Amino acid sequence: MPMQGAQRKLLGSLNSTPTATSNLGLAANHTGAPCLEVSIPDGLFLSLGLVSLVENVLVVAAIAKNRNLHSSMYCFICCLALSDLLVSGSNMLETAIILLLEAGTLATRASVVQQLHNTIDVLTCSSMLCSLCFLGAIAVDRYISIFYALRYHSIMTLPRAQRAIAAIWVASVLSSTLFITYYDHAAVLLCLVVFFLAMLVLMAVLYVHMLARACQHAQGIIRLHNRQLPAHKGFGLRGAATLTILLGIFFLCWGPFFLHLTLVVFCPQHLTCNCIFKNFKVFLTLIICNTIIDPLIYAFRSQELRRTLKEVLLCSWWPGCWAEGGGDSVWPGSCVTLRGPLPP
């Protein structure tokens, strides 16, 4: 489990992370050489998890409430929010349980603790896999919406999206169960690392291709209106910056965790690797940060979703407003029918 003095079963080959007395300090490795170790306070870890939990619950509630958002694209975004919710929730639950056990507040049998430990590990692993899968699914959906715009609604039908979502959840739960069961095999960790790299390559290829097509389209418009080329260059730079931010956040938040798994396989006893292992909780914190950032990138950019979210928040204080909107969108006349597969 990801706490001081405890560890995840998936990473059972690691030594327990020693307690650090400062937020940023130097810990000694086995030879006495200084080793940089960053300690994440439990309060900060739980606070970030709570922010992620609330944020993703709001996304799920907004999409579930507004029927205009019941398209394949928003189904993938909703499932991404749900998987991120489970990532943060499972880590918060695990952290809280360990704190209670260490404080002596929660007293139970070792067998019960082990069963709970295994269940939370499966939930955490499966939700992480789902989160990565739905990030890839959103990229594929947007790619189809751009390159097959005229056939998008016949390709990405809601039943097909629902079948894909069900397949992702089932495959993630089954594979995570196998991963936790055979956690001590190097092949398990390598499979996870390869899966992460595959998702990274998939997203990079699709988004780069989409950026290239967008630049070509912008260049065609510029030529049509006899404008100057610098405007096209500015568009390309903005698109490249957006793409860099999107992929950069994904890599920076998930990369350290999978680097950690890679080092577990190839240098479990190396002194430098042991220094990296001491910062395992930092890597988990980065993943929690990614679950906070995902709604900002994929959900809250949609004007329709933001409007529905405001209505959900208002109606949480004034329950009578649900009846005024007829059940679709809360306020009369606020429904905006989606007329295309454009991403939010």
UniProtKB/Swiss-Prot annotation:
Keywords: Cell membrane, G-protein coupled receptor, Glycoprotein, Lipoprotein, Membrane, Palmitate, Receptor, Transducer, Transmembrane, Transmembrane helix. It is found in: Cell membrane. The chain crosses the membrane at residues 38-63, 73-93, 119-140, 164-183, 192-211, 241-266, 280-300. Residues 1-37, 94-118, 184-191, 267-279 are extracellular. It comes from the Eukaryota. Residues 64-72, 141-163, 212-240, 301-344 are cytoplasmic. GO terms for biological process: adenylate cyclase-activating G protein-coupled receptor signaling pathway. It is a multi-pass membrane protein. PANTHER family: G-PROTEIN COUPLED RECEPTOR. This is Melanocyte-stimulating hormone receptor.
